[in-house]
């Protein structure tokens, strides 16, 4: 696992009325600071990759749909520099994923339904000076194969 990445499996409390699950608590120390909460939708087959931040951490949650999430450690001072992690997240595998600054991240929408992401950041978005650096989805250094392997 890439150094500094944190995974929190979510516990659903279900009964005949539906379910309840806690997402983020102030006593968990997942985010150093709350900056912004955002909500986005992506359609089946979409790949949104890669980008990274120099100043902010991200905390991702996918309440609907299914995602293949790919992380790549770019940090020069990291003991896991150059490592890749892959997570399968979404409505069938509910979890939170903390992505530290300096770790490139992206996702592919799996299946035939749209994907919803709700994410929290440690800084508010500044359109005049965005803390967002982009890397092509097919970057050779990262070298990730986004194709589904049929086995």
Swiss-Prot record:
GO terms for molecular function: dTDP-4-dehydrorhamnose 3,5-epimerase activity; oxidoreductase activity. Signal peptide: none annotated. The keyword Ligase does not apply. It comes from the Bacteria. Keywords: NADP, Oxidoreductase. Pathway: Spore coat biogenesis; spore coat polysaccharide biosynthesis. The keyword Oxidoreductase applies. GO terms for cellular component: cytosol. Coiled coil: none annotated. GO terms for biological process: dTDP-rhamnose biosynthetic process; polysaccharide biosynthetic process. InterPro entries: RmlC-like, RmlC-like_jellyroll, RmlC_Cupin_sf. To dTDP-4-dehydrorhamnose reductase. This is Spore coat polysaccharide biosynthesis protein SpsL. The lineage of its organism: Bacteria, Bacillati, Bacillota, Bacilli, Bacillales.
């Amino acid at each position: 696992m890439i150094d500094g990445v944190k995974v929190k499996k979510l516990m659903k409390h279900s009964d005949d009325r539906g379910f309840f699950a806690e997402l983020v608590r102030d006593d968990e120390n997942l985010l150093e600071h709350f900056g912004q909460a955002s909500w986005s939708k992506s359609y089946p087959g979409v790949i949104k990759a890669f980008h990274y931040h120099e100043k902010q951490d991200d905390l991702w949650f996918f309440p609907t749909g299914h995602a293949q999430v790919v992380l790549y450690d770019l940090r020069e001072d990291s003991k896991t520099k150059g490592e890749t992690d892959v997570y399968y997240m979404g409505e069938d595998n509910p979890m939170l994923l903390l992505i530290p600054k300096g770790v490139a991240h992206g996702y592919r929408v799996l299946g035939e339904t749209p994907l919803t992401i709700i994410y929290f950041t440690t800084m508010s978005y500044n359109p005049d000076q965005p803390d967002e650096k982009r890397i092509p989805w097919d970057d050779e250094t990262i070298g990730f194969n986004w194709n589904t392997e049929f086995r």
